[in-house]
Structures are given as structure tokens and as C-alpha cells.
């Protein structure tokens, strides 16, 4: 009798030891790598499931969590990557991610988030990648990003942000890539970017900016790519890019109804390689346009005036093996002729070519 009882006790003990592990993988979910990866993609969840403390990746895409309450993830201290795309989230409470001090990736794309209040990202001191694109966010309150001292990439494209105010990025001093495409921005207040002077990539395309935000952008120091396409800009002022001119390599100004550059627009710009100017209303380029460093330039669908003022462009085109399809709109007798081939520049005095240093970085 003693032996069967001993076997029963051992069996019950073994079963009891297995129960926590079995219970750690939520129903209908898939768990991998010894419960470190938990996949609950589109399984009908309406509340955040309980998972093992050792979980590092939690994928909760395509479920239904209208509100992320305070401490929703408190029992997941080792989480590194959290996926909450397409979860119909409307509200993120203050302290919703409290306890996630190891989190590096946070995906909140394609939800219905309208308001983000200060405190929403408390404790996320290691967060490096934050995806908030395709929501309905209207503003960034001061202090919202303060805990995010290691943030590198912030995607806020496809929201409804109307204005960037001073202090909007307070605390996010290491931010390098900022995407604000397809919002409703009509202005950037002076001081709006004071806390993110190390931005390298800045996308502002498809907004409502009617004037170049000189005061705000003048605080940036190392921008390598600036995208302003599809904004109703008419002119670019003097010194527009000077504060980061030694770093700027790619500039997008296509589809803006742009009519002119001020003579000093490109002062201080020395490394520009790629410029997009197609589908505008440009007649001329400024005399200090940085052709020397330029590798690619898109020009089509502009009413170019083929006079001697455009001779720098003609010389640059002559040196290219590709043939950008840009044509003269005036004078009338040269209309429709390719800038590279037209006789419109016959008689113009071309400056002596400066030798370039061999090699590229």
C-alpha cells in the first residue's frame, strides 16, 4: 500500500511542478524559446493575458484592448519587445507600461489613440523604438517623452497633429529619426525642436506647412535627410539649412508649389548629394546652389527659364551620364527643349570648373 501511495504523491508533485509552465502560455497563443516568445496574434483577446515573467517578446496584434490601464504589464519585467498593432486602442492611461524597464521596442501602430497624456510612458527608460503611426493623436503634451532618454526612432506619421509646441520632445535628447509625415501640421513653434538637436532624419512631408519653419529648424545640428514634400511652400528663405549644412545629404522639396529659393538659401550647405525638386513652379536656381557635391537631382515638371542664370544646372547636366528629363518653359523659342541639349545657353559665360578630390566616403 505504501508503494502506490508514494508513486501517487510523486506523480501529483510532478504535475504540480508542471502546472505553472503549462499555465504560462495563454489559451490559443503560441509560445516559443522556453516561454520567452509569446505570440497571441488575432486570437480574440479582450484583456491583457498573464504570461511568464521571463517573457521577452509579446505579440498581441489584432486583438481588442480599447483601454490600456495603469499597470497593464506590471508582471512582465523582462519584456523587450511589445506588439500592440491593430488592437483598437483608444486610450493609454498614465503608467500603462509601468515596470517595463527593459522594453526596447513598442509598437502601437494602427490603433485609435487620440490623446496621449504625460505619464503614459513612465518607466520606459530603455525604450529605443516607438511606433505610434496611423493613430488619431492631435498633440504631444510637454513631458510626454521625458522618460524616454534612450529613444532613437519615433514614428508619428499618419496622425492628426496640428502643431508642435515648445517642449514637445523634452527628455528625448538622443532621438535621431523622427517621422511626422501625413499629419495636419501648419506650424512648428520656435523651440519645438530644442530638445532634439541631434536629429539625423526628419520627415515632415504631407502636412500643411505654408512657410519654411526656419526658427524651429535652426536648432537642429546634424540633419542628414530632410523631407518637406507635399507641403504648400512657395519659397525657401536665406540660411534655411545653415545650422546643419555640413551634414545635409538628402533634401526632398518635390510637390510643394515651390516658386523660388532666396539667394542665400543654401549658405553653409557643403555635402548635399540628393535633391528632389520635381512638380513645382521653379523658374531658376540660386547662384550658390551646391552642384559641386550633388549626385542626383530630380527636376521634371517645373517651368524652367533657360537663361544664363541657369547655366550652373546646364554644366552639371552635361557632366552626367544619365539624362534627367527636364525641359525649358521659356524663352518661348526654346520651350520644350531639354536643358542639357538646348542652345539657350550659347554665349553664357561659364565659371572655370573646380577640381574635385578623387574618391568617395
Swiss-Prot record:
Q: Which domain of life is it from?
A: Eukaryota
The compartments listed are:
Secreted, Extracellular space, Extracellular matrix
Q: Where are the LRR repeats?
A: 78-99, 102-123, 126-147, 150-171, 174-195, 198-219, 222-243, 247-268, 271-292
**May I ask which residue range the UniProt record assigns to the signal sequence?**
1-24
What are the alphabetically sorted keywords of the record?
Answer: Disulfide bond, Extracellular matrix, Glycoprotein, Leucine-rich repeat, Repeat, Secreted, Signal
Q: Give a GO cellular-component term.
A: extracellular region
Hydrolase in keyword set:
no
General function of this protein = Promotes attachment of chondrocytes, fibroblasts, and osteoblasts. This binding is mediated (at least for chondrocytes and fibroblasts) by the integrin alpha(2)beta(1). May play an important role in the regulation of chondrocyte growth and proliferation.
Q: Which family does it belong to?
A: Belongs to the small leucine-rich proteoglycan (SLRP) family. SLRP class IV subfamily.
- Please state what the protein is called: Chondroadherin
Write down the species.
Bos taurus
Q: What is the lineage of its organism?
A: Eukaryota, Metazoa, Chordata, Craniata, Vertebrata
Amino acid at each position: 500500500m505504501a508503494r502506490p501511495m508514494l508513486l501517487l504523491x510523486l506523480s501529483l508533485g510532478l504535475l504540480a511542478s508542471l502546472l505553472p509552465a503549462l499555465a504560462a502560455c495563454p489559451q490559443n497563443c503560441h509560445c516559443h524559446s522556453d516561454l520567452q516568445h509569446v505570440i497571441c496574434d488575432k486570437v480574440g483577446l479582450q484583456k491583457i493575458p498573464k504570461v511568464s515573467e521571463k517573457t521577452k517578446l509579446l505579440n498581441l496584434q489584432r486583438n481588442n484592448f480599447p483601454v490600456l490601464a495603469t499597470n497593464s504589464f506590471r508582471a512582465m519585467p523582462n519584456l523587450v519587445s511589445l506588439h500592440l498593432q491593430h488592437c483598437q486602442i483608444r486610450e493609454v492611461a498614465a503608467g500603462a507600461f509601468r515596470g517595463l524597464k527593459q522594453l526596447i521596442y513598442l509598437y502601437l501602430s494602427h490603433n485609435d489613440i487620440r490623446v496621449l497624456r504625460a505619464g503614459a510612458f513612465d518607466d520606459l527608460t530603455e525604450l529605443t523604438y516607438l511606433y505610434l503611426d496611423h493613430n488619431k493623436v492631435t498633440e504631444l503634451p510637454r513631458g510626454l517623452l521625458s522618460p524616454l532618454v534612450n529613444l532613437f526612432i519615433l514614428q508619428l506619421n499618419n496622425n492628426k497633429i496640428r502643431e508642435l509646441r515648445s517642449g514637445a520632445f523634452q527628455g528625448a535628447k538622443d532621438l535621431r529619426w523622427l517621422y511626422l509625415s501625413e499629419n495636419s501640421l501648419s506650424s512648428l513653434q520656435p523651440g519645438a525642436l530644442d530638445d532634439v538637436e541631434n536629429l539625423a532624419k526628419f520627415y515632415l512631408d504631407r502636412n500643411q506647412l505654408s512657410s519654411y519653419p526656419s526658427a524651429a529648424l535652426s536648432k537642429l545640428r546634424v540633419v542628414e535627410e530632410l523631407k518637406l514634400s507635399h507641403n504648400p511652400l512657395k519659397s525657401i528663405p536665406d540660411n534655411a539649412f545653415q545650422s546643419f549644412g555640413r551634414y545635409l545629404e538628402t533634401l526632398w522639396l518635390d510637390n510643394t508649389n515651390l516658386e523660388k529659393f532666396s539667394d542665400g538659401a543654401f549658405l553653409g550647405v557643403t555635402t548635399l548629394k540628393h535633391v528632389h525638386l520635381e512638380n513645382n513652379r521653379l523658374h531658376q536656381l540660386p547662384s550658390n546652389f551646391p552642384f559641386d557635391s550633388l549626385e542626383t537631382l530630380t527636376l521634371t515638371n517645373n517651368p524652367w527659364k533657360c537663361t544664363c542664370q541657369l547655366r550652373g544646372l546646364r554644366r552639371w547636366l552635361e557632366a552626367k551620364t544619365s539624362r534627367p528629363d527636364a525641359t525649358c518653359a521659356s524663352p518661348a523659342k526654346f520651350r520644350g527643349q531639354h536643358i542639357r541639349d538646348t542652345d539657350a545657353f550659347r554665349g553664357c559665360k561659364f565659371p572655370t570648373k573646380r577640381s574635385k578630390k578623387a574618391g568617395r566616403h
